[in-house]
Amino acid sequence: MAGQISPTRSALLASKASLKTASGGADLLKRKRDALIGEFFALVKDALAAREQLGGVSKGAYTSLFGAKAWDSPEAVESLSLAGSGDYAVNMQIESIYGVKVPRINIPERTQTTNFSPINVGARTIQAATDFGGVMEAIVKVAATETKLRRIGEEIKKTSRRVNALEQVVIPGIEDDIRFIRSVLDQREREASYTQKKIKAKIEAKAKQQRKDIQSGNHGSAAD
């Protein structure tokens, strides 16, 4: 960049301002990255807990399913699963975490609306259906938490790349420009000082010679 910049005092001031801006930007990005890292590790705990919860409710649901098949027959369970199948509604909103857009999913409270008569269905089959409803809730929670985790992780990487670009490329480049401009300005100042000294020396030498000439002329007149 030094070869593309004009080595003037105004350019030096502009480069100093750019350096201050870049350094401030790097500091802000590092603070954002640190905050995101803290949020990331908190979400890791939530994600692990959600996964553990999913494993627990899944195990319980399959235990209920096996019991239902044993007591109420596989045909009855399959018939109930077809009768009770349908859409699973969730409420999703977008929230911002340090500028990162992430989904916030709310699971509405389940209501016991069924397409079958409980009189004709065994208690274990109904329990299995209820337990698998809990599995769906756990899956949604895992998906929401891991989506947040992934997006924040991506933002951490992006922010780190921006910090590295500023600290390793932009800021050193501006510092090189400042050193180059200062070097040229210092050289010009030295040259100007040297030129002034030479001019001053010539003027003094000329004045001295003129004084000598005047003195010589005065001596000649006195002798006449």
Curated annotation (Swiss-Prot):
Extent of Basic and acidic residues compositional bias: 205-214
HAMAP family for this protein: ATP_synth_D_arch
Protein's recorded name: V-type ATP synthase subunit D
Classification lineage: Bacteria, Thermotogati, Deinococcota, Deinococci, Deinococcales
Keywords, ordered alphabetically: ATP synthesis, Hydrogen ion transport, Ion transport, Transport
TM region(s), chain numbering: none
Swiss-Prot/TrEMBL GO biological process terms: proton motive force-driven plasma membrane ATP synthesis
GO molecular function, one term: proton-transporting ATPase activity, rotational mechanism
Record NCBIfam families: V_ATPase_subD (TIGR00309)
Role of this protein: Produces ATP from ADP in the presence of a proton gradient across the membrane.
Biased composition range(s): Polar residues: 215-224
Species whose genome carries this gene: Deinococcus deserti (strain DSM 17065 / CIP 109153 / LMG 22923 / VCD115)
This protein's record includes keyword Transport: yes
Family: Belongs to the V-ATPase D subunit family.
